[in-house]
C-alpha cells in the first residue's frame, strides 16, 4: 500500500479531484508497508510521510500544481511509525514509533527540508499522536 494521493479541493462544491498518486516507498522495496502519518511544512512545499513496517519517513517536494516528487527517505530509528509532527517553528520533525514505544527527533534542514537524526529516544508507551500548544500569552 503506502500510496500517497493528492487531490484538488473545489471550495464551491466541496468535492475532491484526484491529481497524483505516487508510492511512498523506494522502488526496490518488496515487503508490506502502510503509509500512516503526514506532516506538511509551513510553506507547503515539503511533505513528510511515515511508512509503517518499512520504518521510514519519505520526503516529497510539492509542486505548484500539487505534484509530488520523491526527495529523500530517512529511517525512523524506531518500529511502526504511527504519526509525524513538525515543531511549530518547523525546525524539528518527530516520529511517533508505536511498537518500539518511543518518539525520535530529527532536525529539518532549512534549505532542502532533509532530515537528520538528532539523537536520543523519548520513551512513551505506544505513542500515537502529538500536538503543540500555542505559546503562552
Per-range role (PLM):
Residues 98-110, 116-137:
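Blade-level signature of beta-propeller repeat domains, shared across WD40, Kelch, NHL, RCC1
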Amino acid at each position: 500500500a503506502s500510496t500517497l494521493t493528492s487531490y484538488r479541493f473545489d471550495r464551491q462544491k466541496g468535492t475532491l479531484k484526484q491529481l497524483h498518486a505516487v508510492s511512498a516507498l523506494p522502488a526496490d522495496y518488496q515487503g508490506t508497508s502502510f503509509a500512516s502519518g503526514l506532516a506538511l511544512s509551513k510553506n507547503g512545499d515539503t511533505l513528510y510521510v511515515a511508512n509503517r513496517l518499512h520504518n521510514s519517513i519519505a520526503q516529497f517536494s510539492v509542486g505548484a500544481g500539487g505534484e509530488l516528487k520523491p526527495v529523500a527517505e530517512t529511517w525512523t530509528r524506531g518500529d511502526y511509525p504511527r504519526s509525524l509532527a513538525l515543531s511549530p517553528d518547523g525546525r524539528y520533525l518527530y516520529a511517533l514509533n508505536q511498537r518500539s514505544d518511543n518518539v525520535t527527533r530529527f532536525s529539518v534542514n532549512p534549505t532542502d527540508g532533509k532530515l537528520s537524526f538528532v539523537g536520543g529516544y523519548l520513551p512513551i508507551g505506544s505513542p500515537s499522536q502529538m500536538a503543540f500548544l500555542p505559546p503562552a500569552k
